[in-house]
Amino acid sequence: EEKARIAKELDALGVDRIEVAFPAVSKEDARALKAVADLGLNADIFTFCRAREDDVDLAVACGADGIILEFPCGEPRMVHQFAKWTEQQVIDLTVRIGKYAKDKGLQVVMFPLDATRARPDFFRRLMDEAGAQPEMDSVVLVDTTGSLTPQAADALVRDMKRRTGKAIEIHTHGDFGMGVAVSLAAVAAG
């Protein structure tokens, strides 16, 4: 109920994309997403999905317009949280699920968790081989640990834009008090 009220207010303000819930996490989140999607707002309704077909199917069933496709790319998460995924597995899975979601009619935002702790060579490959795919509508620079500096954000955003040709978004955390400065540097970089 509260999510629907907030979504209506955001829509009235002219917000063009509203990110609602993570339906794979709970039935309550799935109900909230469906309730917001059923409002018929002008804003596109997006939801978070893991890199799994069943998550994408749930987003479709709940009426989402698009997904924020989460997957690990920082080495600590790939090795310790996600059963030792390899870099190539991450790339292949991201491309496959992006295509699957696009075939279901969804917009796709590529959201590489822990991007700022990824090996630089791998992150560049990820942008070249997955981020540049036509199924990806935009790519997010995800600073999960809040460790990015404004200068690094500027360089990464410029490189991501060059490699993918896509709109680049920023997702920061304020662990070290730099979230706002990093966000502003990313916006200034394009």
Regions found by a protein language model. Give the residues of each.
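A glycine-rich helix N-cap at a beta->alpha junction
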Residues: G40-C49
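Histidine-centered catalytic micro-motifs
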Residues: I168-G177, V182
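Short acidic loop-to-helix transition motifs that present clustered carboxylates
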Residues: K27-D29, R50-D54, D175-G179
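Alpha/beta enzyme core
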Residues: E1-I18, R31-L39, E53-A167, V182-A189
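Conserved hydrophobic beta-strand within the GNAT/NAT acetyltransferase core sheet
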Residues: V20, T47, M110, I170-T172
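Anionic-ligand anchoring segments at beta-strand to alpha-helix junctions in alpha/beta enzyme folds, i.e.
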Residues: A21-V25
